[in-house]
Amino acid sequence: MAHKKAGGSSRNGRDSESKRLGVKKFGGEAVLAGNIIVRQRGTKWHPGANVGLGKDHTIFATVNGSVSFRTKANGRTYVSVNPIAEAAE
């Protein structure tokens, strides 16, 4: 017979804050230079053309354009930005 009540609730009840990872701009979406495209832990997505990779593996646009995702033969998914043609004035 138990001599103490179930005391588990006081020791549990904790959780970490969500990190809001994932794709922020999807394929075909317009981005400005500096916009974050993907937040990730490690390189689930790899940087392609016209994007940069931050120290926390964040992929961001380096030029204005539209986002594209492409899976190559090596099985890796690459994120690129296709630049928009600037109108000549």
Swiss-Prot record:
GO terms for molecular function: structural constituent of ribosome. GO terms for biological process: translation. Keywords: Ribonucleoprotein, Ribosomal protein. GO terms for cellular component: cytosolic large ribosomal subunit. Pfam families: Ribosomal_L27. PROSITE patterns: RIBOSOMAL_L27 (PS00831). InterPro entries: Ribosomal_bL27, Ribosomal_bL27_CS. Residues 1-22 are annotated as: Disordered. It comes from the Bacteria. Belongs to the bacterial ribosomal protein bL27 family. This is Large ribosomal subunit protein bL27. It comes from Brucella canis (strain ATCC 23365 / NCTC 10854 / RM-666). The lineage of its organism: Bacteria, Pseudomonadati, Pseudomonadota, Alphaproteobacteria, Hyphomicrobiales.
